[in-house]
Regions:
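Periplasm-facing N-terminal accessory domains of Gram-negative outer-membrane beta-barrel systems
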Residues: 18, 22-146, 199
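Periplasmic N-terminal accessory/gating domains of Gram-negative outer-membrane beta-barrel systems
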Residues: 96-114, 123-243, 253-265, 269-275, ...
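Transmembrane beta-barrel strands of outer-membrane/channel proteins
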Residues: 129, 250-258, 289-295, 333-337, ...
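Transmembrane beta-barrel wall of Gram-negative outer-membrane proteins
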Residues: 266-341, 358-381, 526, 676
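Solvent-exposed loop/turn elements at secondary-structure boundaries
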Residues: 529-647, 758
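C-terminal beta-signal and adjacent terminal beta-strands/loops
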Residues: 613, 724-745, 768-826
Length: 826
């Protein structure tokens, strides 16, 4: 059966199921036999007066139970209620649950409820955590790490939020700290901080750092995300940070430096971070400051004194403020600073000081957001953000750079400077709900971005020697200095309808339009998703969706023809005679404007909550990408003369399929255990990455993507232990990532991804005890990362002609960890 017919048939079947569900579930829960005249409007706000959407409402009177969920404006109206006294329970994950025992319908037409965000250290002992729930209004395939999970679960580099994301199934991290969601490349992911784009505008990488202690939650959406999100086919990473309230609060983490026993007792690193928050004016204005500092000293045992040390420092701070101009008009501003510098970066036994780099990079984000609620029920949210990214890479000196199988010598061959800016303007409008064959909530919005980018390179010739010291290759650059610049303008708009024919069925349909000055064509992205509550108790849900997604134009890929050329001169075994003319490496843009990379995604899921506070989730997702951006090498045979004349092409095709099962159990006292298994396949017909700095003299070819992990088991949690301690753990096992084999001429040997790293396994354990000292609440943790000492490698010598072929490096091994946190004053 042709593919389009199969998909059409699936769509018809699904719509038929929805139609039947409307007829079966068309009668709302409530009091169907009695005439009703009363109504109750529930308004849910947080402690700062911001509307809380998707809050679960349970209204009970005797044996009658009514359920509802707040809309975008934090409102929900219970209609046709008999007068009387009710109990109202309000819950949402990430907030403390709240119960109003006496809500008198008939005496009041509305009730305003304040939900407080969960905090690690609270003044009251009678608070109740909102348990994981089956959310009838969530059609997106999304997963959340809340503040408790981010702080309690042990993982590598707990000061970097990117290392927490692999705690979610479907999310893997590569050796360069970059994140991949459901088989996607990092640049196919949209990263946002409090609703603003923080993705690097050139590379598409996630490089911005935020103080982990300031993060309230991280939401990862991998499929079925609505049309308000675009410019990403891989998924959405949404970081949400906190805000002060009417109490002054402070916290501090890792404020004591650590030491190391290398060449005597030496300073190792110091990574303090803290948060300070409180009112500027109680009930109306608040602030948050979240500074962090990192200083590292790297000592290499094998190097001589005076040439054995590298240092790195980093400073970051998030400053936020919120002012409620009126209860219906809220203004929020923020300023994020990242600044780091590394001296002698890359220092190792194989890379002496003279061959290292001095690295400097910075990122800045300035935002302003206005939220207005109008009396007619309209919600208007406007935003303005400016961001800047700067990267510099400076070698030490100007000595000729020489690469040997055992060590490098001289000064690194390349100097680079890069600057990029993004100006972002957003506007979103939520219209009042409309009753027409059910309830409709309409949302429209726009996103306008202006991106500028410039980069310069200064490259010097370098040589590559064989094991016996003879010259194998000499590399020269026709233009030692290269400068490039590229700008882009992006315009987006969307319209979305959330239709609830009944209290058990939700259909979310929308369309998105995108245009930019590189592709220069209007991109239309229709999407459809729905959720159906299979049981009246709200504990079982079926969800499915299909949609078209486009990637943002990647300036790094499209600008490669401007990045310069290089010539490789190959020598015979004696290192004296040239084997032929030099091989030129160049990139060329094809004719006409490129097409936008496009994906068609569809997925289906089943969720169920057992009475024992156990939550089960099953899911299947399929992604099919086409028109992907890549470069092709015209050489067609591995025996043909070396060639590196790369031509831009829209011929990349990516495939991803995955089945996932996960379970979560919550214990009394907010302890929990999570486990999941994912079976997946991530492949492409173009997996070879070509670049001027590291060319591959082979044709483009297909195979598994470098982050493909067909089998993965993941588990983590924290449980009560002896002596009032909590035992926390994380366990991650997955198939090793694939890698390609090359020869000394940088030609592929066999198909790409023909070999794999050993299976990855890491078990992290930690014990934490909370106690009071001098009136302050503290938490002391000690544990081990990779307690089994698995020695998971990050890199491999993939040169089949190298005497160290298949030698693994980048091995961490077992690491003792400790953490001291000041939670506040008791």
């Amino acid at each position: 059966m042709p593919r389009f017919l199969r998909r059409s048939l699936l769509t018809i079947v699904w719509l038929s199921m929805l139609k039947g569900a409307v007829h079966r579930a068309g009668t709302p829960q409530g009091f169907p036999s009695e005439p009703q005249s009363r109504s109750l409007l529930v308004i849910v706000l947080d402690e700062n007066g911001v509307a809380v959407s998707s809050a679960s409402l349970i209204l009970t009177q005797g044996q009658t139970v009514l359920r509802g969920e707040t809309n975008y404006a934090g409102r929900y109206e219970f209609a046709r209620l008999p007068a009387g006294t009710y109990q109202l329970r309000v819950e949402k994950e990430g907030f403390f649950a709240l119960v109003h025992e006496e809500v008198r319908v008939g005496e009041a037409e509305s009730i305003e409820v304040t939900l407080n965000h969960q905090r690690e250290f609270v003044e009251r002992v009678d608070v109740t955590y909102s348990p994981p729930a089956v959310d009838p209004a969530r059609t997106t395939s999304s997963q959340t790490l809340d503040r408790e999970e981010i702080l309690n679960v042990p993982y590598n580099v707990t000061r970097d939020i990117r290392y927490a994301l692999p705690l979610l199934p479907g999310v893997v991290q590569d050796a360069f700290s970059q994140i991949h969601i459901d088989g996607s490349s990092t640049h196919q992911i949209y990263d946002e901080l409090d609703g603003f784009n923080i993705t690097n505008p050139v590379s598409g990488l996630f490089t911005v750092r935020v103080n982990v202690d300031a993060v309230r939650s991280v939401v990862v959406q991998s499929s079925r995300y609505p049309v308000e999100y675009g410019k990403a086919t891989g998924g959405i990473v949404s970081l949400k940070t906190g805000m002060g309230d009417d109490y002054f609060r402070f916290s501090a983490t890792d404020f004591f430096p650590s030491v190391q026993s290398r060449k005597g007792l030496q300073f190792s690193n110091w990574t303090p971070r803290g948060t300070f928050s409180g009112p500027l004016r109680k009930g109306r204005a608040w602030f948050l400051l979240a500074p962090e500092v990192e200083y590292d000293l790297n000592i290499i045992q094998e190097l001589p004194p005076g040439a054995d040390r590298g240092t790195a420092w980093r400073f970051g701070n998030l400053a936020k403020t919120q002012v409620n101009l009126t209860p219906a008009n809220i203004l929020t501003g923020s300023f994020l600073v990242n600044d780091s510098n590394s001296q002698h970066a890359g220092l190792s036994r194989l890379t002496p000081v003279e061959s290292t780099l001095n690295l400097s990079d910075a990122a800045y984000l300035l935002t302003l957001r206005d939220l207005a609620y109008f009396p007619n029920g309209v919600l208007l949210e406007t935003g303005l953000a400016w961001s800047r990214f700067r990267d510099r890479s400076l070698p030490l000196g100007d000595q000729p750079y020489v690469i040997t199988p055992d060590i490098v010598r001289g000064s690194y061959f390349e100097t680079s400077h890069s600057h990029s800016d993004r100006l972002q303007v957003t506007a979103d409008v939520v219209l009042p709900p409309v009753r027409l064959q059910g309830r409709h909530e309409f949302k429209v919005g726009t996103d306008i971005d202006r991106i500028s980018y410039d980069q310069s390179f200064d490259r010097q010739p370098f040589s590559i020697l064989r094991e016996d010291g003879t010259l194998a290759r000499r590399v020269k650059f026709p233009a030692s200095s290269v400068a490039l610049a590229r700008n882009n303008a992006e315009f987006s708009g969307y319209a979305q309808d959330r239709w609830s024919p009944s209290d058990r069925l939700l259909v979310e349909a929308g369309v998105r339009l995108d245009w930019d000055q590189i592709v220069r064509g209007v991109l239309v992205s229709p999407r459809l998703a729905s959720s159906l509550m299979l049981t009246r108790d709200g504990n079982t849900k079926l969800v499915a969706g299909v949609g078209t997604y486009y990637d943002a134009s990647n300036l790094q890929i499209i600008s490669q023809p401007q990045a310069g050329e290089r010539f490789d001169f190959f020598y015979d075994k004696n290192g004296q005679k040239l084997l032929g003319p030099p091989v030129a490496t160049s990139f060329r843009q094809g004719e006409g404007n490129p097409k936008a990379p496009q994906f068609l995604n569809w997925s289906v899921g089943l969720e169920h909550r057992f009475p024992t506070t156990t939550y089960l989730r099953l899911g299947f997702v399929q992604k099919r990408g086409f028109n992907g951006w890549t470069y092709l090498n015209p050489v067609t045979e591995s025996t043909a003369p070396l060639s590196a004349s790369y031509v831009f092409s829209n011929s990349r095709r990516d495939h991803y399929d995955a089945f996932q099962i996960q379970a979560r159990h919550t214990f009394k006292g907010d302890h929990m255990v999570f486990a999941s298994y994912v079976r997946s396949s991530a492949t492409s017909n173009a997996v070879v990455n070509f670049s001027v700095d590291n060319p591959v003299f082979s044709p483009q070819a297909g195979g598994p993507l470098p982050w493909d992990a067909p089998n993965r088991f993941l588990s983590w949690g924290w449980v009560p232990f002896w002596w009032k301690c909590d035992l926390a753990y994380s366990l991650d096992w997955h198939t090793g990532f694939p890698f390609s084999v090359v020869n000394e001429n940088q030609q592929l040997v066999g198909p790409p991804g023909s070999m794999r790293f050993p299976a990855y396994f890491a078990l992290n354990l930690a014990l934490e005890r909370r106690f009071t000292f001098l009136g302050y609440q503290l938490a002391l943790r000690a544990g081990f990362d990779d307690i089994t000492n698995r020695h998971n490698p990050a890199f491999v010598d993939n040169n089949i002609d190298s005497p160290k072929f298949l030698t693994y490096t980048g091995i961490q091994g077992r690491t003792l960890t400790a953490r001291l946190r000041l939670l506040g004053r008791k």
